[in-house]
């Protein structure tokens, strides 16, 4: 998936040159704010950590893509109440990842932002299972979360061969 969380900002292939306000050696993961505990005047050690962030060019458009891999056996079929799907905490956290990177995304003129849950499937093809949306967060300009089921055998093969998936296959 070409995870770029631990890549220094100065190396990333951005739509425009890195803005001067950013440290070229700082990593993408380090842009996420840590909680400040006001009584101590100190920040906590931990913060939000997305599974994967990819910066790629698809159809001449620079995309900032935030992935969260889930190991659920979700049943998502038209007209049927969903079961086995990621919970509210996973959904809100995925929206927060975008919010955490929003300034960086705006500063560097990305064409689009994509949020996506990746779930396994025993089938042989990538499956588009729509999106999950929370209107109050969509109304803030955050992107709804796309759902893609990835064949488990494909994921294993890519991992074992050290290969990266072509993002266009996900049709985000």
Language-model regions, residue ranges each:
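Catalytic core segments in nucleotide and nucleic-acid processing enzymes
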Residues: 1-172
């Amino acid at each position: 998936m070409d995870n770029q969380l631990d890549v220094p900002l100065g190396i990333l292939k951005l739509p425009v040159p890195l803005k001067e306000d950013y440290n070229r050696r700082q990593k993408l993961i380090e842009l996420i704010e840590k909680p400040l505990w006001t009584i101590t005047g100190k920040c906590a050690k931990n913060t939000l950590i997305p599974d994967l962030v990819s910066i790629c060019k698809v159809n001449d458009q620079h995309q900032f893509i935030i992935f969260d891999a889930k190991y659920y056996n979700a049943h998502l079929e038209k007209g049927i109440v969903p079961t086995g799907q990621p919970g509210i905490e996973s959904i809100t956290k995925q929206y927060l990842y975008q919010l955490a990177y929003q300034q960086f995304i705006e500063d560097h003129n990305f064409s689009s932002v994509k949020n996506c849950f990746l779930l396994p499937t025993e089938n042989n093809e990538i499956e588009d299972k729509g999106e999950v949306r929370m209107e109050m967060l969509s109304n803030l300009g955050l992107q709804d979360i796309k759902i893609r089921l990835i064949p488990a055998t494909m994921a294993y093969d890519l991992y074992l061969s050290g290969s990266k998936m072509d993002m266009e296959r996900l049709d985000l």
